[in-house]
Amino acid sequence: MDARWWAVVVLAAFPSLGAGGETPEAPPESWTQLWFFRFVVNAAGYASFMVPGYLLVQYFRRKNYLETGRGLCFPLVKACVFGNEPKASDEVPLAPRTEAAETTPMWQALKLLFCATGLQVSYLTWGVLQERVMTRSYGATATSPGERFTDSQFLVLMNRVLALIVAGLSCVLCKQPRHGAPMYRYSFASLSNVLSSWCQYEALKFVSFPTQVLAKVSKVIPVMLMGKLVSRRSYEHWEYLTATLISIGVSMFLLSSGPEPRSSPATTLSGLILLAGYIAFDSFTSNWQDALFAYKMSSVQMMFGVNFFSCLFTVGSLLEQGALLEGTRFMGRHSEFAAHALLLSICSACGQLFIFYTIGQFGAAVFTIIMTLRQAFAILLSCLLYGHTVTVVGGLGVAVVFAALLLRVYARGRLKQRGKKAVPVESPVQKV
C-alpha cells in the first residue's frame, strides 16, 4: 500500500492525529520536568531492584546453594540464579530452517505478502501513534489547549505489559524448548531495553520523528562497537564501508534540515543526546540477547523473560514516584489517549510475533529488507501527517542511508552464497 493511501486510512480511523496542524511545544522549564532529572529518578528506581537482586545472586553463588539448598524455595532459587541446563554452545546446534515439502511458490508468495503486510501495518501504525501520543495534546477545545502526556515510563509499561501477556500465551499454547537460562540474566537486557525505550519516547519531545528513524538506522555503528566489546566479534570491510555511508547520509539529513517550530539549539541538543542514549542502550540489549541465545531458548521465551523484568522495573519505579496512579488518571480523563496507548501496545506486541514468524519462514535477509522499506515509509508517512519538511539534500541523505542498508543485505547474501560466516543480524527481540 502506497504511503499516501496509508496516511488517508490512518487519518480516517483517527481524525485527531492530524488535527489542526498543531506544532510540538517545548517541554516545561521546571527542573523536575527536565528529562535528565526524570532519567536519574527512573534509574534510581530501577537500581532499587537491581542492586539487591544482584547481591542476592552473588550470595547464593558464594554459598554454593545449588549443592546445599533444599526446601520449597530451592526450585525458584535454582531457576532464577543457576538455570536448569548447560549452555547450548556445548550441544549440537539447531537444525536450519526448512520449508515444508508441499509448499508451492504461490503459497510462499502469499505467506511473504502476509508477513510484509503485517510488519508494515503494525510498525507504521505504531510509529504514527507514537508521534501522536508524545507530541500532541489531548482534550483540546476552542477555549482550552488541552494537556500533554509527559510520562514516557508509563507508556513503556503499557507496551511491556501487553507484550508479556502475548509472550506468556504463546509459551503456553505453543511447544517451547526446555528453558535453561538463569532468570536473573534477563534483567540486564530488560534494564537496557526499558532505558532505550524511554529515551526513544522522550526524544520525540525534542526532535522530529524522521530524525529519530534515521538515528535508529545509524545504530548499526554502535551495534558494531558493542559487538566488539561484548561479543568479541570481527567485521568485514564492507560493513565498515556501509556504516560510513550511513553516517554520511544521516549527517546530510541533519545538517540540511531546518529547525522544527518552537525548537531551540538547547532542545535539539537534548533530543540528540536522548537518541544517542537510545542507540547505546539498544545496542547493548541486542548483543546481550545474542549472548543469552546460547542457552538455546526460543524467541518467545526471550520475549517473555525480558518483558517480565521490564514490567517489574517500571511498575516499581512508577510506584516509588507515585506516577502510576497519575498515568492511570490521565487515561481516565482522556479516553482517546487510552485508545491510542492500547493500540500502540497491540501493534508493538503483534509486530514482535510477525518478526519471529517472518525470520522463521524467510530468514533474516528478507526480514531486513521489509523493515528497511518500513523505515522509509515511516519517514514519508510522518511528513504527510505531521508536516515535517525535508530538503533536497536531506532527501538525498535519506536515500544514501537506505541504499547503504540494502547494500548490507546484498553483501550478507553474497557471503552466505560463498559459504562464509556472515555477521548475524541484530537480535529481533524488542525491536521497539
UniProtKB/Swiss-Prot annotation:
Gene Ontology cellular component annotations, sorted alphabetically: endoplasmic reticulum membrane; Golgi apparatus; Golgi membrane
Compartments where found: Golgi apparatus membrane
Gene Ontology MF terms: 3'-phosphoadenosine 5'-phosphosulfate transmembrane transporter activity; antiporter activity
Residue spans crossing the bilayer: 5-25, 40-60, 109-129, 154-174, 238-258, 265-285, 299-319, 353-373, 387-407
Main localization (coarse): Golgi
Keywords for the protein's UniProt record, in alphabetical order: Antiport, Golgi apparatus, Membrane, Phosphoprotein, Transmembrane, Transmembrane helix, Transport
Top-level division of the source organism's lineage: Eukaryota
Membrane topology: Multi-pass membrane protein
Phosphoserine: residues carrying this PTM: S427
Catalytic activity field: 3'-phosphoadenylyl sulfate(in) + adenosine 3',5'-bisphosphate(out) = 3'-phosphoadenylyl sulfate(out) + adenosine 3',5'-bisphosphate(in)
Any one biological process term the GO annotation gives: chondroitin sulfate proteoglycan biosynthetic process
Family per record: Belongs to the nucleotide-sugar transporter family. SLC35B subfamily.
PANTHER family on file: ADENOSINE 3'-PHOSPHO 5'-PHOSPHOSULFATE TRANSPORTER 1, SOLUTE CARRIER FAMILY 35 MEMBER B
Task of the protein: Probably functions as a 3'-phosphoadenylyl sulfate:adenosine 3',5'-bisphosphate antiporter at the Golgi membranes. Mediates the transport from the cytosol into the lumen of the Golgi of 3'-phosphoadenylyl sulfate/adenosine 3'-phospho 5'-phosphosulfate (PAPS), a universal sulfuryl donor for sulfation events that take place in that compartment.
Name of the protein: Adenosine 3'-phospho 5'-phosphosulfate transporter 1
Natural source organism: Pongo abelii (Sumatran orangutan)
Gene this protein is translated from: SLC35B2
